[in-house]
């Protein structure tokens, strides 16, 4: 079996150096009109960047993504725009509900708590929308119902190639 040549290797944090939309666009431009083989090895990162890279793969057309190692979160979303997705026999793939960093320190009075609760309810509603969007993307790719994928995301377990 011939060894695959990877035109793009995306490793590390999605949204970090060499794993952002600008870098991917530049690398895809060098392969205009050609099949592009992409290796992904990432525990995830920025959902916004993952969605953007997915769109870049879809716009390019003939993109094949291959996962190695442990892959999660935004890295899995980035792959969804590829024409073909494969996973190494020993690799793992994690889908989970979206999350957001939350830091609140100090003492709060009743009014401040009310404001904080309202802010948290808004964040929860936004996260629910992001979860629905991701579930729809995964579901379209694997030809399942979004509700099934949302349940899988809620569990947040690692999936193997099997």
Regions found by a protein language model. Give the residues of each.
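Terminal-region recognition feature
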Residues: 1-162
């Amino acid at each position: 079996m011939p060894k695959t040549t990877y035109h793009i290797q995306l490793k590390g944090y999605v949204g970090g150096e060499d794993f952002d939309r600008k870098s991917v666009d530049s690398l895809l431009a060098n392969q205009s009109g050609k099949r592009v083989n992409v290796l992904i090895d990432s525990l995830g990162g920025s959902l916004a960047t993952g969605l953007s890279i997915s769109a870049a793969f879809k716009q390019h057309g003939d993109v094949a993504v291959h996962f190695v190692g442990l892959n999660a979160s935004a890295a899995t979303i980035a792959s969804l725009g590829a024409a073909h997705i494969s996973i190494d026999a020993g690799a793992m793939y994690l889908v989970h509900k979206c999350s957001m960093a939350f830091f609140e320190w100090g003492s709060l009075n009743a009014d401040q708590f009310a404001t904080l609760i309202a802010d948290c309810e808004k964040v929860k509603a936004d996260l629910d929308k992001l979860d629905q969007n991701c579930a729809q993307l995964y579901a379209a790719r694997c030809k399942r119902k979004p509700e099934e994928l949302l349940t899988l995301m809620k569990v947040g377990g690692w999936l193997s190639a099997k």
